[in-house]
């Protein structure tokens, strides 16, 4: 009997049908050995000896493997074709050697395949190799590094930062990215700027829109027009001008398809198009790879899903091109196959890109046979694979340059149309921030043609801070920096959320206070080890180990020597030194720029400062013990809060920007929650204030939103039937419409700050209908 060992029962079931009766396929159910979660599992003083244990969960599977191996003439190790798969095979072989007293390595044959198809399996079995010790050592080095960081840094965190749960070699760097972005957002000061749009009409009475680009030969920049007065003055001048078409430019633009999916791009696109988390994407992809039941049989539908290679096999390309020619026509088929090269930092490119194993299994043919989410992901992979070998999209672009008759003002109008849809026929890549109009057409225009200015529209804008990371954009950033590996991204994001270091709100990552504390501590006392370049450099070293260019224990020794010295140094630091550093580093985040926000809300004379207690970090009054005010700054850690009003702590008290008169607008916190304030209090004259609606998070409040809130109640418009005003406002009961002395609540599904006149009239009509139904 020939024994074949794979990781999962699903994979075993699929492979078993391709091999004859002389083979027996069994599963290891993942890793059978690992480093136990205790001190001493990796021993630097003993040349980094690693003490592996068989887990209780894996015990029964190991017994079965050992028992079957005793009957076998040969053992085929058929785990996944990457470092982790190589490592699992090595552990299986080591356990069999130990338990069955096997001395010869010839008893084991390593078989690797990129897809679970009969052709790939039979070819792998016919061409076995030996275990690749370089790949095994690279995986052992990664595991040792992660252990050494986790099991030396985490206990130090527990002592120095009570309440913090863990630190990890890669997770801490990903957390720093999220926290650094939040710092940028908090310190960002929104600035006002304007641009001018002109609604124009050609000689055929066709309307189009242009944008003012030059005034008196000076090109307008973003901040050329910075306030309403300047915008209105310019608007009045433009209304007096007559424009004509000075020049028309026409050109073609070609758009090339994106490469086939790699792990990171699949996670990003599944997040954007399907709303899947990275974890969910990988779970479904794993099932599609290992084999799913499609009615008549169980087959592996996609190639291996942990890869950073963008190449496709020659056979796959030939099949794809054949299908394109048959289904879409020769005009969609390039003369030559497209060959892609990876742009990923540290790409290993050992495997093909992610593609269907059989391109003739179209999504439509499988729609009734796959679970809904399995179908969605397969459809995404299939379309991307087809598109990557299709012709370019061709865009016809038209640019109309307009000039005033006195040449003082220039404007520009752009139009585009898809001349040939190319790969758009089957697939378009999504973007995090899409702002693309492929079919914004201009009406027919001729050079020197005089055109009418129907309307001049000044547009007010505010600069916005960089957006928070989504799962897709964070994976992309990690990939760009060379941090982590395709197989690790999903687990990194999950761990950060499980540890309560970050929250995912509206599909964007927001750091929790606990996460910010950990990051500030690590940046202050372990800066080298959370630097992006250093972490990427370690990935390079692991690649060199895998390639046989670097001895793995040399790499571990180089890392450990400096890291252990850092640990010992921080262990000796006094807790007061750490608190003082944290206080200084978190000062802006906790209190903003307003010195008053540090005043104790209980005694009114003491100053709030950061303290560390057994339940975590908290703010306390400097007048202790006379004043015992305390407030936890970590959500869920309110054990140390016994006096004072917690809602009065000013954790978010910052300047959002200024209004058109230059008066500063603040976001503050008071006894009844957060509120917006216009200017400072002058004597007994209180500044204008307005509460922040309960459905708005403080982190979402921008200058633009604050200005809208301060302007409430606000006239939306005139009711077309009655001629009466419709007013939008906000009270302690929530947003409302005021119409003919009646107050009508605005449901949560509406964005009341941007409520349209039509929606307001619908709400008025619905309210009227309800009253008529109720009272007759």
Swiss-Prot record:
Tagged with keyword Cytoplasm: no
GO CC annotations, alphabetized: chromosome
Positions of the record's site feature: Interaction with DNA: 31, 142-143, 146, 158, 306, 499
ZnF start-end (C4-type): 600-627
Residues annotated as domain Toprim: 1-111
Gene Ontology biological-process entries: DNA topological change
Listed cofactors: Mg(2+)
Name of protein: DNA topoisomerase 1
Source organism (scientific name): Rickettsia prowazekii (strain Madrid E)
């Amino acid at each position: 009997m020939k024994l074949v060992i794979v990781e999962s029962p699903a994979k075993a079931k699929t492979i078993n049908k391709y091999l004859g009766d002389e083979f027996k396929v069994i599963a290891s159910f993942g890793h059978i050995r690992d480093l136990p979660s205790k001190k001493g599992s990796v021993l630097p003083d003993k040349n980094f000896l690693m003490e592996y244990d068989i887990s209780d969960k894996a015990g029964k599977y190991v017994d079965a493997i050992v028992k079957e191996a005793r009957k076998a003439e040969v053992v085929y190790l058929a785990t996944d074709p990457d470092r982790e798969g190589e490592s699992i095979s090595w552990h299986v072989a080591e356990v069999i050697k130990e338990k069955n007293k096997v001395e010869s390595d010839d008893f084991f044959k390593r078989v690797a395949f990129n897809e679970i198809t009969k052709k790939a399996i039979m070819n792998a079995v016919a061409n076995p190799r030996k275990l690749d010790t370089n790949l095994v050592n690279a995986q052992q080095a990664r595991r040792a590094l992660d252990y050494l960081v986790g099991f030396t840094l985490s206990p130090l965190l527990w002592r120095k930062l009570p309440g913090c749960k863990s630190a990890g070699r890669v997770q801490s760097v990903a957390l720093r990215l999220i926290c650094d972005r939040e710092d940028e957002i908090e310190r960002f000061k929104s600035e006002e700027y304007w641009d001018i749009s002109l609604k124009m009409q050609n000689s055929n009475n066709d309307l189009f829109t242009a944008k003012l680009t030059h005034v008196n030969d000076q090109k307008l920049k973003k901040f050329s027009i910075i306030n309403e007065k300047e915008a209105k003055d310019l608007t009045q001048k433009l209304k007096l001008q007559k424009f004509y078409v000075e020049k028309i430019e026409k050109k073609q633009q070609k758009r090339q398809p994106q490469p086939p999916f790699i792990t990171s791009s699949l996670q990003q696109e599944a997040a954007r198009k399907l709303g899947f988390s990275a974890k969910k994407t990988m779970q479904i992809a794993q099932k599609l790879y290992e084999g799913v039941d499609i009615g008549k049989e169980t087959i592996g539908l996609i190639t291996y899903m942990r890869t950073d290679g963008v190449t496709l096999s020659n056979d796959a390309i030939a099949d794809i091109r054949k299908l394109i020619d048959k289904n879409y026509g020769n005009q969609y088929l390039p003369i030559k196959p497209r060959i892609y090269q990876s742009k990923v930092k540290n790409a290993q490119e050992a495997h093909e890109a992610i593609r269907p194993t059989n391109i003739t299994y179209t999504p439509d043919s499988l729609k009734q046979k796959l679970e809904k989410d399995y179908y969605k992901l397969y459809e995404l992979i299939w379309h991307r694979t087809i598109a990557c070998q299709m012709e370019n999209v061709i865009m016809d672009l038209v640019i109309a340059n307009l000039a005033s008759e006195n040449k003082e003002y220039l404007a520009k109008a752009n139009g585009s149309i898809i001349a040939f849809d190319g790969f758009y026929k089957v697939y378009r890549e999504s973007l995090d921030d899409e702002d693309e109009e492929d079919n914004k057409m201009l009406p027919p225009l001729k050079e020197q043609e005089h055109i009418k200015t129907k309307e001049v529209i000044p547009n007010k804008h505010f600069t916005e801070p960089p957006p928070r990371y989504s799962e897709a954009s964070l994976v992309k950033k990690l990939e760009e920096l060379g941090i982590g590996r395709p197989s690790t991204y999903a687990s990194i994001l999950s761990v950060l959320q499980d540890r309560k270091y970050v929250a995912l709100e509206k599909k964007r990552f927001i750091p929790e206070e606990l996460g910010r504390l950990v990051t500030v501590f690590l940046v202050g006392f372990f800066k080298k080890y959370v630097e992006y370049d250093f972490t990427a450099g370690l990935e390079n070293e692991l690649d060199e180990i895998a390639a046989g260019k670097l001895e793995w224990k040399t790499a571990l020794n180089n890392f450990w020597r400096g890291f252990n010295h850092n640990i010992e140094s921080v262990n000796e630091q006094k807790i007061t030194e750490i608190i003082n550093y944290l206080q200084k580093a978190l000062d802006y985040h906790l209190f903003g720029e307003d010195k008053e926000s540090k005043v104790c809300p209980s005694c009114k004379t003491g100053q709030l400062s950061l303290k560390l207690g057994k339940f975590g970090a908290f703010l306390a009054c400097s007048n202790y013990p006379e004043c015992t005010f305390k407030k936890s700054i970590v959500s869920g850690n309110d054990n140390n809060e016994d006096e004072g009003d917690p809602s009065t702590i000013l954790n978010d008290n910052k300047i959002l920007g200024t209004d058109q008169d230059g008066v500063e607008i603040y976001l503050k916190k008071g006894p009844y929650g957060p509120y917006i304030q216009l200017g400072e209090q002058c004597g007994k004259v209180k500044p204008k204030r307005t509460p922040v609606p309960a459905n708005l998070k403080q982190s979402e409040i921008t200058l633009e939103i604050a200005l809208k809130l301060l302007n409430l109640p606000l006239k939306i418009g005139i009711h077309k039937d009655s001629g009466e005003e419709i007013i939008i406002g906000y009270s302690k009961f929530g947003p409302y419409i005021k119409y003919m002395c009646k107050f009508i609540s605005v449901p949560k599904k509406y964005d009341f700050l941007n409520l349209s006149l039509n929606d307001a009239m619908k709400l008025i009509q619905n309210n009227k209908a309800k009253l008529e139904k109720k009272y007759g």
